[in-house]
Amino acid sequence: MNVPKYDAIFMIGPQGSGKGTQGKRLAEKLGYFYWEMGGILREEAKKSTPFGIKVKNLIDAGKLLEDEELFRVLQTELPEVIKHKRILFDGVPRTVPQGVHLIHYLQQNGFKDFGAIHIDVPKEESVKRLLERAHHEFRTDDTPEKIGFRLDLYESETKPVLKFLAGMGDLYTIDGVGSIEEIENRIDSVLNI
C-alpha cells in the first residue's frame, strides 16, 4: 500500500456526509492520528465550566463556535496533537480564518504537506442521514430545524474553505453517496492506496 505524502489530511463535508466514518477508517489504515473537533466539543459541553456551558448551549442550538473560541480550543489541544507526525483532522477547519490559523500553526511546527478530502453529498442525503442518526443516537443538534440551519452554515461558511485548502495542498472531491465501502474505495483510489 502506498502511503500519501501528507503530514496532515483534512476531512471536509457537510454534517451527515460520513466524514467521521471515513476519516476514522482512513486514519487507521494509514497510521495517522485521528482528531475530531466535534468529539472534543461534545466532551467540553459535558463540563460545568463557563466555556463548557457555552459550548453546550451552542451545540443544543445547532450553532458553531465563533472562530476566536475555536482558536482557544485549538491552542489548548494542538500542542499535544502535533506530537503525532501525521494527523487526520475531522471537522476543522470550518471557516477560512480557522484554516489560516490551523495551517499557520502546523507550518510553524514543521508540517509541510497538506491534503484535503471533500466528501460531497446532496443536502437531501445529508438530511436523511442525520434524521436517521437522530433516531438511533440522542444528539440534541439533530432536529430538522437545527439540521437545516447547520447545512446552510456549511454552504455559507465551510464551502469557501475548500478553495483555501486547494491553495495550500491537494484537494480531492469524492462523491459521498453510496455504501461506506464504495466511498472508502473512492477515497483509496484518489489517494492511490
Feature annotation, model-predicted:
Residues 1-193:
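Glycine-rich phosphate-binding loop of ATP-dependent small-molecule kinases
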